């Protein structure tokens, strides 16, 4: 792994010159983080992407793969959505002017092991284990199509096929589910020991039923032939979170039996 800065053009050229395909996943990824830090979001997401595109052009990269979001369809998502929309336009211009091939991946709701602090499922699992309580803004009727991070990773490689060149691809789950059903599932897996509380939401940056209001280039959705079942994936995430926060934070208080390891592939 090389630790660096995506606005360091010299370092970018050194790294990118050794490759034929570039995956760009760097930048500010949390909606709240982007809302709180618009300047950093513009610098990392928009300017950073421009630096990477320029380096790809200079080094004759065969394909530029960009991690976008389903929020590009929306008028929600604050500066996060704005930055992703801007990046997609930049990519289109580099394709039109410099013939830089691309694939734009619009990710839906991801979950799985090693989730960061703003991942919804990862966050509520941590709440449940530490506090025996989940506080959710909204009424739980919000709809999401969750996809396990391993399934998303497989799809992100499959798009290297030639038919996905210069394409917009949606990577999301094969089934939709209400948020309240996710929370109830987590509660059941933890022996019904969790209190679930719904509070009025002051955050207007997240969608409830659908993100579709703004209309960018339409994307094809990859339908996964094989994928991780949602319940098993959430259970695996519970084990992973429990292991990471330590044995003193959940097992004794919640009176649940956790195996030492879980075989989840």
Question: PLM features: what roles do these ranges have?
Answer:
Residues 29-32, 70-77, 108-111:
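Active-site segment of SDR-like NAD(P)-dependent oxidoreductases
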Residues 26, 65-69, 106-108, 172:
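Active-site beta-alpha turn of Rossmann-fold NAD(P)-dependent dehydrogenases/reductases
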Residues 8, 21, 48-51, 63, ...:
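Conserved cofactor-binding/catalytic machinery of classical short-chain dehydrogenase/reductase
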Residues 132-265:
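C-terminal substrate-binding subdomain of Rossmann-fold SDR/epimerase-dehydratase oxidoreductases
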Residues 79-81, 85, 89-144, 149-158, ...:
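NAD(P)-dependent short-chain dehydrogenase/reductase
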Residues 3-43:
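NAD(P)H-binding glycine-rich loop region in Rossmannoid oxidoreductase-like domains
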Residues 32-39, 74-78, 116-117:
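Conserved catalytic-core motifs of eukaryotic protein kinase domains, centered on the activation segment
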Residues 24, 43-81:
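Conserved Rossmann-fold NAD(P)-dependent oxidoreductase catalytic core, especially the SDR/UDP-sugar
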